[in-house]
Curated annotation (Swiss-Prot):
Name listed for the protein in its UniProt record: A-type ATP synthase subunit C
GO biological process: proton motive force-driven plasma membrane ATP synthesis
Domain of life: Archaea
SUPFAM superfamilies assigned: V-type ATP synthase subunit C
Cellular compartments annotated: Cell membrane
Gene behind this protein: atpC
One GO CC term on file: proton-transporting V-type ATPase, V0 domain
Gene source species: Desulfurococcus sp. (strain SY)
Amino acid sequence: MEAVTGILNTTIAVVFTWVGYKTARIIWKYTPYSYPNARIKAMEAKLLTEQKFNELAESRTLQNFVVNLEDTDYKDYLADVSSYTVEEVEKALERALAGTYELMFKILPKRSKGFFELLLEGWDVRNIANVVKAKLANEPASDYVVELGTMLPKVKAMAEAKTLEEILVILEGTPYEEVYQKLLLGEIDVTRFETELYRMHYGKLLSYALSRKDDERIILEEFVRLSIDRVNILTALRAKKAGLSAEEIKPMLIPGGTVKLDPLLHVDSFDMALAELDSTKYGQVIRDVREEIEKDLSVLEKALNDHIIERISELERFYPLSIATPLSYVLRREREIRKLRAIAKLIENGVEPERIKELAGEVA
């Protein structure tokens, strides 16, 4: 009897230990997202509606544009706008996006912050590439700096640099030093330089995603691979339109995507390249905008961006207490700010409101 009781007690102890472990694991996985995701959901409700965008398109002046945003979350960022130039408005909108990232770092669980830091590094890559290209083209580099990223002071110093060699000193000790040195030595051209920057960036994103577990890995890996596919598809199609060969295009592509682009690279025309994509998982996305793509590839860029957001939103519904919610919000916020920037530029250029509404809807 005592042996039976002992076995029973041991079994109960094992069961309770297992239940305790599973409960603790569930709490560890999901509870940290309860507060931030609830807060983000409240913020999502404040994203601008189509009606609001139409109202902004009717502004006619940038001063009215700013006034029409006073009842939104952009009010504080636009408070210092005084000369009402498009550059001033754009800088304010960039600060708003930076504020979104800062909030994510503040409210998200510690284990999630690393991915958003890597996303922010993507703005470093964009800034570095733009500054270097501007310098090589003898254009004012500061005009191409976005007020966002983890190394903004260095980027601004690069923009002010008098020589290309001075930029190398500024980049010393960063992950970008070696590839920039290759550019200076003439070992690679500026196109390959930019490709290498983005290869490093997406490589880091993918490595991070693959290092995660469970739903976090599913969500982040899906996002990164979709993002790589988007870049590669657009790069390949632009190159095909420019008449480049498969051998010229291959070094421009980023590893880690899901779409096999080799058949596309070896076809003879842009139309045939689009036809090759028809049998991929992006076939429907492309078919929906096929006619417009032939005139303007930015239409496909917008469609692919929207597809990524929709996919992350689907994952958010499946994993409501996860990193999908903040990721979805940041992507929507970035899209919103791109649209606001486009409207501001069109207003400054004197475009009629109805045309602004039409063009703003096409912004990626």
